[in-house]
Amino acid sequence: MQDIIQSRREFLKKMAITGSVATLAASPWLSAFAQPSTAGKSPSDRVRIAVIGTGSRGKQLMRFLFDLRETNKLQITALCDVYQPHLQEANNMCKKQDITPVLYTNYESLLNKEKVDGVIIATPLHQHAHIAIDCMKAGIHVFCEKSMARTLDESKAMYDAHITTGKILQIGHQRLFNPVYLEGMQRIHNGDLGQLGQLRAYWHRNNDWRRPVPNNSIEVERFINWRLYKEYSAGLLTELMSHQLQVANWALRKTPVSVTGTGSIVFWKDGREVNDNVALIYSYDDGTQFIYDSMTSNKKYGLEEQIMGHKGTIEFETNRYYTETPPPAPGILQLINDMESGFFGKAMIGGASWVPETAVKYNGEPIIENTDFYDSALQLEGFAKYIRAGKAPEALTKEGYNASIWTLLGEIAIETGEKLTLAEKYRI
């Protein structure tokens, strides 16, 4: 894994050093990768990290920290989780890496007792805001998993705490560090796709999204499967769509002006409270629309973000670029030549409907050639670099905030059945 991370790091470094002014303006968070390596610094100069929330995502991020700790001089000093099985699993992972973090079941005790430079918050969504705010007030930089918070007010309070304290607040939108997306966005912003008319994204699964509950305990069911209950999460919206809405905002370099949507529980009638399928339309001030849908009972189309302009299309998840004028296949080219030369004589053609307007059969071309990378590792490396610098590009925080706030407004639009705009007090 370290070799893969190194190759992608070099890609980002090259983009940061050789990229155009427009590229760095659109992705200013890349600038950190143009700085010299910190590997030669003394052991006392290690960036001290605490992980709050050691469930599945927290442990996944820890694995990346293990691979980054030497090249970036990171030290995992403490772990915190209210659920002992998760905490012990994470501690066992550390032991295998000869790491001995201090364990906590209360994050406030961690803040009072440990000296840390940064925290990684990977708790359930409804816990993000108060933990992040307390950390920033304690003088600690924050990496918080997406979405930002459970409510509009909590999200704004997090952003305000970031402004007031001057501490880093990075939200976990790893696509911002993904070389495919960075290269694709450069093409979009350079005008390679022409005028953008519509953006579409979807995330389709075919499972109930439930996690196993020890002994089928009713007491811990909501605790383990928090994504399915409105008190803790907006389900498909905050856990999935927020990623793809961030991509749409990034491509357009703006935020929506309105949202409308619908959703229901049509398949998994198992006691969950969040919708198992949703569809939304976000409109922008130039008339461009971002059309989104997500479902949990069919996975044929998987997930994708499609950025469509009059000159071409980019599909990020599959790493493809499609021009609107693809080169003709050899057989078609021969047919055209034969018709132009009169080989077939007169041909009767029944008008414009002669060619059905089905999907174009064209495989496109890759956005980049090598896609062996871990964007979640690259975003954590960026976090470490920002901690050393004492600041992060404000655009990075705004990307996370705007994606989160408009995701939550989308939830309200579905619940009310209304077309909504964002109140002025939430705009930044």
Segments the model singles out, each with a brief description of its role:
Residues 19-97, 178, 248:
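N-terminal Rossmann-like dinucleotide-binding module
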Residues 14-43, 120, 350-354, 361, ...:
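C-terminal helix-rich "cap/oligomerization" subdomain common to oxidoreductases
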Residues 1-20:
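N-terminal secretory signal peptides and thylakoid transit peptides that target proteins
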Residues 100-121:
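A structured beta-alpha segment of the ubiquitous adenosine-cofactor-binding alpha/beta core
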Residues 124-125, 129-177, 191:
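Beta-strand-loop-alpha-helix segment that lines the small-molecule cofactor/substrate pocket
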Residues 210-220, 225, 232, 236, ...:
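C-terminal glycine/acidic-rich active-site capping loop/insertion
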Residues 53, 57, 164-171, 175-272, ...:
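Predominantly a Rossmann-like dinucleotide-binding segment in NAD(P)-dependent oxidoreductases
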